[in-house]
Amino acid sequence: MKVDIGERIKYWRKEKGITQDTLAKKADIPYTTLAKIESKIVTNPRMETLIKIAAGLEITVDELITK
């Protein structure tokens, strides 16, 4: 089964009650990068980016991908 990483990030971001802009700042990534991942323009982000996003969400990469 393929994980829709954009949907997973959006789910966790909304679960945490934060905006894309806030998450981008917490993850130290460009807002446009996050927006492209969530809107499925970028479907295979780099692992480094996923690690930063997970840290910004205060979850593990495993939680981001599997839960």
What is each PLM-predicted segment?
Residues 18-37:
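Short alpha-helical DNA-recognition segment
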Residues 3, 63-67:
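Short hydrophobic/aromatic patches at helix-to-coil boundaries
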Residues 1-15:
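A short, Lys/Arg-rich alpha-helix, primarily the initiator
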Residues 10, 14, 28, 39:
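Residue-level detection of the helix-turn-helix DNA-binding "recognition helix"
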Residues 14, 25, 55:
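Alpha-helical residues within the helix-turn-helix
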